[in-house]
Design a protein with these regions (language model features):
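Sec-dependent bacterial lipoprotein signal peptides
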Residues: 1-9
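Electrostatic cytochrome c docking/interface patches
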Residues: 10-29
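Disulfide-bonded cysteines in secreted/extracellular proteins and peptides
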Residues: 11, 33-36, 90
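Inter-heme linker and motif-flanking segments adjacent to c-type heme-binding CXXCH motifs
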Residues: 14-17, 42, 110-112
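Gly/Gly-Pro-rich "capping" loops immediately C-terminal to redox-active cysteine motifs
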Residues: 21-25, 38-71, 87-95
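Thiol/selenol-based redox catalytic cores and closely related redox-interacting motifs
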Residues: 69, 90-91, 98-112
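Proline-centered turn/helix-capping motifs that create local helix->coil transitions or kinks
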Residues: 71-77
Length: 112
């Protein structure tokens, strides 16, 4: 129930009562990304920093990765090597709406 309310909170209603575009920062928090990547995306012993990812990723590629990280990493030597440094695998977000994944991707790609 808590997860559902957190996810619904990521898509706030605007002044007209219609759903506004999801906030990437809110979706990041609601989906638990901070548990491994830190509340500010600086990384931890469970997941790499998310700062500076714009040099490696486009929005479309990052959304595809979030949907199927294991398969994506197998085809990318840089990700396969990075995966060896962390004990937890990247969670698959294939059930998360595309608009929310795109919002998270935009948020991550704008981290310095």
């Amino acid at each position: 129930m808590l997860v559902l309310s957190s996810v619904l909170g990521a898509c706030a209603q605007d002044a007209t009562g219609t759903l506004a575009a999801p906030s990437g920062e809110r979706v990041y928090a609601a989906q638990g990304c901070a548990l491994c990547h830190g509340s500010d995306g600086a990384g931890s012993s469970f997941g790499p920093t998310l700062h500076g990812k714009a040099r490696y990723w486009t929005r479309e590629k990052l959304v595809a990765y979030l949907k199927a990280p294991v398969a994506y990493a197998e085809a990318d030597p840089r990700l396969a090597e990075q995966k060896k440094r962390y004990s937890l695998p990247m969670r698959q977000f294939d059930k998360v709406p595309e608009s929310e994944l795109a919002a998270v991707a935009d948020y991550v790609l704008h981290l310095p």
